[in-house]
């Protein structure tokens, strides 16, 4: 199978990146040292090519009403242009089709950023719901492989770390209006060399920073200028350890179409209180929460916490969904779906290679803004 490539593929290879198949995309896992890349994001600034993710623009007078029924979170929270919201998109059974970010720019102009592996299915689902509801929303994917004729393909570079914003401003003075942005807000600026840049104060690392949505034809220039400014290229390996430390779910690993957001630690993104109806609401209300989604820290030596390992508790068995060795904590950490009777602070047993090793149940996240929140 031929892998898809982002517009930065040649640059990754020129930098000596180790490339892997990530959901059908040829992506860099690291550029030599995953731990150094991780630490650069925690202490300074690193950048990630996330152009495999897909921007989807939604336009039309009924866009807000359409999204009110499409998403589990309530887009009525979005009243200020540029404001963003994290949400799940559910099927009728309450399973997670995808988790995404929705941006509001005007009543007839919203933007979604969806995951790479689910993008084609997401677009098909959104179009089907649009047809079924007669909303008349114009749906325009902006990733190169799915953008329609006449739509400028877009790419995304995430610049993350305590010094990320300053380095972006110094490299691209046109982005200075983003200085006033609060987290989960975006602004669109025009750069004379790059063109239109959407600067979003969002990310997937637990650090401050920006996600820059730029014309795909100019993303190489963005990357090279940031590289010259001392922003360290970082791959999927560091991205995974950073997001795990930050307590951020990965679609396909921590939740999927067979998982309720209530069982994946995402109840805070689901609006069950208002009278608004949305796809999957009735199923969620009927099922309720059946499992907890909590963190684990391995206490015994002799293993690393990994996905699918069994967790033995006094309240019954659970399962790890994501696990890794944390560079920031120098400990093995994990997310786990656990029975409702388990409490933070409990000691549980994790089955690792025919051994049972002790782990402590903790509240997520493990690390945020460079500071350990657990011990």
UniProtKB/Swiss-Prot annotation:
It comes from the Bacteria. The keyword Transferase applies. It holds the Pfam family GCV_T_C. GO terms for biological process: glycine decarboxylation via glycine cleavage system. Disulfide bonds: none annotated. It is an enzyme of class 2 (transferase). GO terms for cellular component: cytosol; glycine cleavage complex. It catalyses: N(6)-[(R)-S(8)-aminomethyldihydrolipoyl]-L-lysyl-[protein] + (6S)-5,6,7,8-tetrahydrofolate = N(6)-[(R)-dihydrolipoyl]-L-lysyl-[protein] + (6R)-5,10-methylene-5,6,7,8-tetrahydrofolate + NH4(+). Its EC number is 2.1.2.10. Keywords: Aminotransferase, Transferase. GO terms for molecular function: aminomethyltransferase activity; transaminase activity. The glycine cleavage system catalyzes the degradation of glycine. Belongs to the GcvT family. The glycine cleavage system is composed of four proteins: P, T, L and H. This is Aminomethyltransferase. It comes from Cupriavidus pinatubonensis (strain JMP 134 / LMG 1197). The lineage of its organism: Bacteria, Pseudomonadati, Pseudomonadota, Betaproteobacteria, Burkholderiales.
